[in-house]
Amino acid sequence: MKLQKIVSRLQELHPKEIDLSLDRIQSLCKKLGNPQDKIKAISIVGTNGKYSTIQAMFSILKEANFNCNIYTSPHIKSINERFVFNNEELNDEDLANLLEEVEEANNGEPITFFEILTAAYFLKASQYPDNINLIESGLFFRFDATNILKNNLASVVTSIGLDHLD
């Protein structure tokens, strides 16, 4: 119940105007100590097959004794699916506490729900500096909130549909 209340509050912060810049996510992450600069990531971009690609990479890395964190969007059953740390989904209580911490740092500023979730992911992922982060990126990466990573080890491009060629 606590998690649902926090999610509802965070969704109300959505800005009234569309702004495709990365200013909001950069500002929030700066308040959080720039956690995105402390993680090693592989970004997965494309129109189709991102989740399947992430799951295949996760299986390979896990078999090779790497610990992984995963950030995907959207979720199917529960928001927790988006947040995998040390090979395990984040439980409701830990996710609620994480989102509250990020909400407090944001201080009521307009921000998209995705940007809040992304900042929360970066903050938690920074607690696992040796893990490989498999991060699904949208908007063909350029204006996606995940595109503020400093230590992107690689980018994997899945199939590209015509809708992403404009």
Show which residues each predicted segment covers.
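A conserved segment at the C-terminal end of the G1
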Residues: 40-44, 52-69
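ATP-dependent carboxylate-amine ligase catalytic core
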Residues: 16, 22, 26-37, 63-150, ...
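Residue-level signal for inorganic ion chemistry
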Residues: 10, 47, 68, 134, ...
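Non-catalytic interaction surface on structured domains
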Residues: 8-12, 30-40, 56-57
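General structural feature for long, well-ordered alpha-helical segments within catalytic domains
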Residues: 6, 21-24, 40, 53, ...
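Conserved beta-strand segments that form the floor/walls of ligand-binding pockets within enzyme
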Residues: 43, 84, 156
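Conserved beta-strand/loop subsegment of P-loop NTPase cores
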Residues: 154-161
